[in-house]
Amino acid sequence: MAPAVLTAIPNRMSLRSLKWSLLLLSLLSFLVIWYLSLPHYNVIERVNWMYFYEYEPIYRQDFQFTLREHSNCSQQNPFLVILVTSRPSDVKARQAIRVTWGEKKTWWGHEVLTFFLLGQEAEREDKVLALSLEDEHALYGDIIRQDFLDTYNNLTLKTIMAFRWVIEFCPNAKYVMKTDTDVFINTGNLVKYLLNLNHSEKFFTGYPLIENYSYRGFFHKNHISYQEYPFKVFPPYCSGLGYIMSGDLVPKIYEMMGHVKPIKFEDVYVGICLNLLKVDIHIPEDTNLFFLFRIHLDVCQLRRVIAAHGFSSKEIITFWQVMLRNTTCHY
């Protein structure tokens, strides 16, 4: 009996090896076929930003506002307006911001307003969810929504909506910031930073990304096609985690948006518009003001930052409470 058992074991191992070999061969064949089926484009090394420009404003978006803020911002002169991109389902994230960095409306006598940017639910809306969003807006009055689909690829439409809203309904804002729900904002630090600026016109800053390469790989979220963006390098731009601009730039950028076809990445899109307008990005001297990647921050670091990306709603609440403690920092 022993020889039979010994013979069976190698046979099973051989069968298993054969299965793995066939699987790997199939995968390799699929990748080869997929690669050969792709249209091949020559990546353009030298960037010509006029490639994106149309003389007539044929890209002006005409989506309708279906929800708007309760406060009459057009009759106010806010020092800073913070516009936060959000999904309809991000109820907890919006509430976390309302009770932390977006709660206080006045900093050292300067008015700061926070609003949320949404599109329509991409899938068929559950009636309970739709009603809860309407109720949420009725309660807080801080939701701005247009009738385009709320999807990742439509983030640029949200940004265009933000610029249009400022022009039409809040034109007196001295500064405007666009950010996301997973970003921790040290609002007090942000206001101090803006108050200490030497100039307040044609100002644009954030986490600068210079000589950032366009990605053509498998990861869909970061991929951009050659048809949409044929150049190897993106323009200088600020990460969408949080960029800040002076109020005078908002109508200039929005006007340019009507001449530039939207692309997948809203922050890159704004960067293209800035380059066409010949507006330089202000690079902060302190490199610890904006954090693009998720990092561990202690209470003293939190007090120094302006914006840090990659946090849950629960973490934002916890970090805000920690930051407000009477802890002495020696650096």
Swiss-Prot record:
Residues annotated as glycosylated: N72, N154, N198, N212, N326
Instruction: Report what the protein is called.
Output: UDP-GalNAc:beta-1,3-N-acetylgalactosaminyltransferase 1
Superkingdom of this protein's organism: Eukaryota
- Per the record, ranges on the Cytoplasmic side are 1-20
Q: Which family does it belong to?
A: Belongs to the glycosyltransferase 31 family.
List the InterPro entries hit by this protein, alphabetically: Glyco_trans_31 (IPR002659)
Lumenal face: residue ranges? 44-331
Where in or outside the cell it occurs: the entry states: Golgi apparatus membrane
Which keywords label this protein?
Glycoprotein, Glycosyltransferase, Golgi apparatus, Lipid metabolism, Magnesium, Membrane, Signal-anchor, Transferase, Transmembrane, Transmembrane helix
Bilayer topology annotation: Single-pass type II membrane protein
TM stretches of this protein:
21-43
- Tell me which PANTHER family the record gives: BETA-1,3-N-ACETYLGLUCOSAMINYLTRANSFERASE (PTHR11214), UDP-GALNAC:BETA-1,3-N-ACETYLGALACTOSAMINYLTRANSFERASE 1 (PTHR11214:SF153)
Catalysed reaction(s) here are:
a globoside Gb3Cer (d18:1(4E)) + UDP-N-acetyl-alpha-D-galactosamine = a globoside Gb4Cer (d18:1(4E)) + UDP + H(+)
Q: What class of enzyme is it?
A: transferase
Q: Which GO terms describe its molecular function?
A: galactosylgalactosylglucosylceramide beta-D-acetylgalactosaminyltransferase activity; N-acetyl-beta-D-glucosaminide beta-(1,3)-galactosyltransferase activity
Q: Name one GO cellular component term.
A: Golgi membrane
Tagged with keyword Membrane: yes
Enzyme nomenclature, EC number: 2.4.1.79
| Record pathway | Protein modification; protein glycosylation
Known function: Transfers N-acetylgalactosamine onto globotriaosylceramide. Plays a critical role in preimplantation stage embryonic development.
Question: Is Transferase one of the keywords UniProt gives this record?
Answer: yes
Where is the major localization of this protein? Golgi
